[in-house]
Amino acid sequence: MVPVGTKIISIPTSTTEQPIQLSPSPSDETISNAYAVVWVDSEDKIIVRKPAGISGTAVSELAYDQRGIILTGSSTRLGSSTWVEIYAPTGGTGWVNFWYLTEDVPPARFCEDLRVNALLETFVSGLINHDGETLTRVVNPKRGLILRHDWWNPEVLYSTSSVSSIYSDLSEIDWGVLGGSDFHILGSFREIILPQLEDVFLISPEVKCNEMIAGVTTQVAVWPREFDNMNFYVFHRPSPEGGNKYDWRTWAIGIEYVENQPYISVLIQYRGDI
């Protein structure tokens, strides 16, 4: 199960690699086995139910930014969704849809994890070489790869099985609309998204961990609230010195852990608007 409104995409050369400079890590610590809530709007909550399923009785609830959730170890498959049993914050146990949980990794520990550095370097290598197989290895096996042309535009989801063909598939996709207009952004990943990724990653961008970098814009550039518990890296190409102050671009990469291994879940673009 994926969030309502998410567009699901399922689709049946080489240059010199430029390393991205990331903060060094002193250690590779064991990640906590607790979970946190993701993909829930700041105005919403997750209902904890018993038994599992949307028809189960509500026994508790989780806030959109709830952390420290412990699983009992029991799970069940209901249709296309996996439900897991948790220890409810109000006591006892109950069930929630596993899509809305992520392994709870403290931000400071995340920013010191050397495996994340290696993950991002592999991602950049796959991007530079247009290598879908390499990209597949770094994408979240639980979710696939989710992209937003702009942070406020709808999500487009590439299933795990379709990521390997992301560079070669030319199917037209609706990526949302241009800011302040009804003009839809239509085209393939290769036509629309790839040039905008290369605009940032083929240079030596500014890099921050769990911190946004943005230039001049009429809309505040923010990491979406529904991803408050998801760690991220930001890569920023500033506007040219003495040039158009709106001509900048940032890509934020949301990273989650699956069985204690980091994977890329989300790519979100930020850019100047006039």
Model feature map: region roles:
Residues 52-57:
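Short alpha-helix capping/helix-loop boundary micro-motifs
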Residues 117-118, 136-226:
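Short solvent-exposed beta->alpha transition segments
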Residues 94-100, 200-274:
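Short beta-strand edge/turn micro-motifs at domain boundaries
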Residues 61-99:
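SH3/SH3-like beta-barrel superfamily modules
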Residues 103-125, 129, 137, 148-151:
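Short, low-complexity N-terminal intrinsically disordered segments enriched in polar/charged residues
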Residues 33, 43, 81-83, 250:
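Extracytoplasmic
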Residues 2-32, 87-111:
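Boundary regions of SH3-family modules and the immediately adjacent low-complexity/disordered segments
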Residues 66, 72, 123-131, 139-143:
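Sec/Tat-exported extracytoplasmic proteins
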